[in-house]
Amino acid sequence: MTSIALFGAGGKMGHRLTRNLKGSRFEVRHVEVSEAGRARLAQDFGFTCVPAEEALAGAEVAILAVPDTHIGKVAQSVLHLLKPGMMVVVLDAAAPFAGHLPARPDLTYFVTHPCHPPIFNDETDPEAKKDRFGGVAAKQHIVSALMQGPEEHYALGEEVARTIWAPVMRSHRVSVEQMALLEPGLSETVVASLLDVMREAMDEVVARGVPAEAARDFLLGHMNILGAVIFKEQPGVFSDACNKAIQFGKPALMRDDWKKVFEPEEIAASIRRIT
C-alpha cells in the first residue's frame, strides 16, 4: 500500500482531499497545524493528525494542500525529512512556476489541478448538478505535470490526482509552463475578468430600469446558447445582427493588445502577485 503524507489536511482543500482519499488504496497520514482543522478532521472523519516527522516516515508521497503563499515555507520546513525518490504533489502551478520548491533533484515534483465540472455536461443526479467545484459528485477533467523526476513516476502521480479529484473524466498531461498559461492566464486573468465585466453589465442594465430578475435570466440564458455555439458544443451560427454587434462590441470593450497577458513576463508577473 502506498503511503501519503497529507499536509494541510484540515484546511478547505485538504478536507476535500481527505474525503476522497478515505477508502482508497492509499494509506494517508494527516498533518494539520491548526487546532480547528484537527478538530474538524476528527469530527468529520474520525482521523487523528500526526506530526510531520511521523507522517513522512516511510511515506512515498507528500501532498502539500496549503495556500500558494505557504508552499515554499512548508516544503522547506520538511525538506530534511523527504527521502530521495519521494514524490511531492502540489495542487497549483503558481508556486512551482515561481521557483518556490526547494532545489532537490532527487525528489519528484508532480503538479495537478482540476478543470472543474464543465458547463456543458450530462449530469442528471441533483447532487452532481449542485457540485460546481467538483471532487464530490460531478465529473470533471484534470491537468497534471511531471515537473521533475523519473518518467515512470507519472503513473503514480496521475493515480493520486484521479483519486483526489474524483470523479474524473479526461486526464490531460501538460507542462508546468502550460498549466500557468491555463491558470492564472486563461481561467483567472481572462475568464474571471470577463465574467466580472458581464456581471457589471447586468448591474448596469438593471440600473437603467430593467428588472433585476429579468436581466439575470436573460443574461444566463444567452450565455448558455451563445457559449454552446462559440465553443462548438452544438452546430449553429449567429444571426447577422449578433455578428455585427460582436464586430463593433469587441473594439469597444477590449484593448488591441489584450493577448499580451499570455506573454511569459506577464504570466510571471501575475504569479508573483499571488505567491
Each model region followed by its residue ranges:
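Rossmann-fold NAD(P) dinucleotide-binding segment
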Residues: 56-101
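NAD(P)+-binding Rossmann beta1-loop-alpha1 motif at the extreme N-terminus of oxidoreductases
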Residues: 1-45
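A short glycine-threonine-serine/GTX helix/turn-capping micro-motif
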Residues: 183-192
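Short acidic low-complexity segments
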Residues: 45-59
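Amphipathic alpha-helical segments within well-ordered protein domains
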Residues: 199-206
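Rossmann-fold dinucleotide-binding core
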Residues: 91-183
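NAD(P)-dependent Rossmann-like dehydrogenase/reductase catalytic/cofactor-binding core
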Residues: 138, 206, 210-275
